């Protein structure tokens, strides 16, 4: 009974959840700003006048790339792209017109959105400036080099390691050459030794008949002495 009640409760929760309209959260504009409009007219405005959707000029920005405020209150956004290295400049009092002007010194625009951004200050993050930046590209930073003292210590360490490796390699090579020479010399030394052994054995084998002849002559001498 308890299992059926639990299953019924879960089913009711699913039905109630499906009956409610789903809310799609749009990305926020960040702290201190409010998002107004939708689609290509989506704007991010600073909190200037609570309760009012429209914001004064220079306090709103269109979220969609290449779109810009078309009036002082930024009620609508208009499409106006610019080439890389340029920014959009609005003209007019009631309805804005646009033109593209070059980015100021120290700023860049890599795309066609018409907004120039400041170059990255490499020294602020403790880096060196590899490329200072221009109107179409940001500055490129690289880590600072190590101090000269650290370079000196590293150089000494590397030299010592290289000397040790060279010494070990030389010793290993010398041992290898010595083993090869020994292998070539050993067969030549064993052949005379074998001949010496064979000659010694042959000499021993020839001594036995001489000893037998000596014994026979001694016996003959004894026998000869018996005969008158």
Curated annotation (Swiss-Prot):
Gene3D superfamilies, A to Z: Tumor Necrosis Factor Receptor, subunit A, domain 2
Q: Which residues carry a glycan?
A: 36, 40, 121, 134
What results from changing residue 209 to A? Does not bind to SIVA1
Q: Which cysteines are disulphide-bonded?
A: 29-44, 62-74, 69-82, 103-122, 116-141
Which parts of the chain does the record assign to the membrane side Extracellular? 20-153
Specify the effect of residue 201 to R: No effect on binding to SIVA1
GO biological process, alphabetically ordered: apoptotic process; negative regulation of apoptotic process; positive regulation of cell adhesion
Q: In which tissues is it expressed?
A: Preferentially expressed in activated T lymphocytes.
Q: Which residue spans belong to the Cytoplasmic compartment?
A: 175-228
One GO molecular function term of this record is: tumor necrosis factor receptor activity
Q: Where are the TNFR-Cys repeats?
A: 28-61, 62-101, 102-142
Q: Return the InterPro entries for the record.
A: TNFR/NGFR_Cys_rich_reg, TNFR_18, TNFRSF18, TNFRSF18_N
Protein function: Receptor for TNFSF18. Seems to be involved in interactions between activated T-lymphocytes and endothelial cells and in the regulation of T-cell receptor-mediated cell death. Mediated NF-kappa-B activation via the TRAF2/NIK pathway.
Q: How does it assemble?
A: Binds to TRAF1, TRAF2, and TRAF3, but not TRAF5 and TRAF6. Binds through its C-terminus to SIVA1/SIVA.
Tell me the protein's name. Answer: Tumor necrosis factor receptor superfamily member 18
């Amino acid at each position: 009974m308890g299992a059926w009640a639990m299953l019924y409760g879960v089913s009711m929760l699913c039905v109630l959840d499906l009956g409610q309209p789903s809310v799609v959260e749009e990305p926020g504009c960040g702290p201190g700003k409010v998002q107004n409009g939708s689609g290509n007219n989506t704007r991010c405005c600073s909190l200037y006048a609570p309760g009012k959707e429209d914001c004064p000029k220079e306090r709103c920005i269109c979220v969609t790339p290449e779109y810009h405020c078309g009036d002082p209150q930024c009620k609508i956004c208009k499409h106006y792209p610019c080439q890389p290295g340029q920014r959009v400049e609005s003209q007019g009092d009631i309805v804005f017109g646009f033109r593209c002007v070059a980015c100021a010194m120290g700023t860049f625009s890599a795309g066609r959105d018409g907004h120039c951004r400041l170059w990255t200050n490499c020294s602020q993050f403790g880096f060196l400036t590899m490329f200072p930046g221009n109107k179409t590209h940001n500055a490129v930073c690289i880590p600072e080099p190590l101090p000269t003292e650290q370079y000196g210590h590293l150089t000494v360490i590397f030299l010592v390691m290289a000397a040790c490796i060279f010494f070990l390699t030389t010793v290993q090579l010398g041992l290898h050459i010595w083993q090869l020479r020994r292998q070539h010399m050993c067969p030549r030394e064993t052949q005379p030794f074998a001949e010496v052994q064979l000659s010694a054995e042959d000499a021993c084998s020839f001594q036995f008949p001489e000893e037998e002849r000596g014994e026979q002559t001694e016996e003959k001498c004894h026998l000869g002495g018996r005969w008158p």
